[in-house]
UniProtKB/Swiss-Prot annotation:
It is found in: Cytoplasm. Has 3 domains, the large (RuvB-L) and small ATPase (RuvB-S) domains and the C-terminal head (RuvB-H) domain. The head domain binds DNA, while the ATPase domains jointly bind ATP, ADP or are empty depending on the state of the subunit in the translocation cycle. During a single DNA translocation step the structure of each domain remains the same, but their relative positions change. This is Holliday junction branch migration complex subunit RuvB. Gene3D superfamilies: 1.10.8.60, P-loop containing nucleotide triphosphate hydrolases (3.40.50.300), Winged helix-like DNA-binding domain superfamily/Winged helix DNA-binding domain (1.10.10.10). GO terms for biological process: DNA recombination; DNA repair. It catalyses: ATP + H2O = ADP + phosphate + H(+). It holds the Pfam family RuvB_N. GO terms for cellular component: cytoplasm; Holliday junction resolvase complex. Residues 261-337 are annotated as: Head domain (RuvB-H). It comes from the Bacteria. Residues 1-27 are annotated as: Disordered. Keywords: ATP-binding, Cytoplasm, DNA damage, DNA recombination, DNA repair, DNA-binding, Hydrolase, Nucleotide-binding. Belongs to the RuvB family. It comes from Shewanella loihica (strain ATCC BAA-1088 / PV-4).
Amino acid sequence: MIEADRLVHAQPQGTEERDEQIDRAMRPKLLDEYTGQDDTRAQLKVFIEAAQKRGEALDHMLIYGPPGLGKTTLAMIVANEMGVNIKSTSGPVLEKAGDLAALLTNLEAGDVLFIDEIHRLSPVVEEILYPAMEDYQLDIMIGEGPAARSIKLELPPFTLIGATTRAGALTSPLRARFGIPLRLEFYNVKDLSSIVTRSAKVLELPIDQEGAVEVARRSRGTPRIANRLLRRVRDYAEVKHDGEVNKVVAESALDMLDVDVEGFDYMDRKLLLAIIDKFMGGPVGLDNLAAAIGEERETIEDVLEPFLIQQGFIQRTPRGRIATARAYQHFNLIQPE
């Protein structure tokens, strides 16, 4: 199964224009509208207020954590709270030094430059970024060959917000230049059900508390997945029921979508059962596991494993992955002694 085809995968999907408009409407615009991540929210309020009192640009910020938890949304909120513009790009898009220079030279004082997947910056672009972050200077080469010369351009104070799902993949010099590191965690059911309720209002979808909790419970602690499942539950409710969502309707819709009570789909169950059945519960090395389920190492490490480990279904050990007692219980299997 291709990762992008999964309802419960947390990467953004290519959607039609109307879905993109709905996604934008679902996003909170200010910190007071942002649900969950209480520690991060409290820290940001202090940092933003302090920067505003001093009349300075906010310090550079690194937001990291699993996909779908609101890194892009948080960057937009920071820009809104600071009352500045935001320019967005991603690491793979910035292929040449000139690509980054074009963005930096168009920033105004205090603006936010948001770079998603910042761990994928090329070394050439990263080298240009260091003096820009530290000294608000841009070192660029003019001309080629013997006639080439370096010139320095002064940049207005700006805030770089980098987002990544793989903080460990950042180089040490780049990571050290971020004054504000923020880790986003998976959401609990209570906070996620509040997000579902808010999104349902945007969709003009009647949903009761139990229905919202059921959607939240199967959303893998991830707002992006919750909003995607909510749209599919809405489709089911409009066709099979009277358009309203309660616990029974949500359960029926999500069962039809093959998303179980833990938020697992076919790929999650395939991974867990491979460890249990093919490798006797583990330990199993990542390469063997990837070959057994026909997936890439990176997909297992970055997409499948984080939630399964966080929820206690898989344990990582020096010798490999192990299925926990909770994994056996999920499939009503007896764990070997």
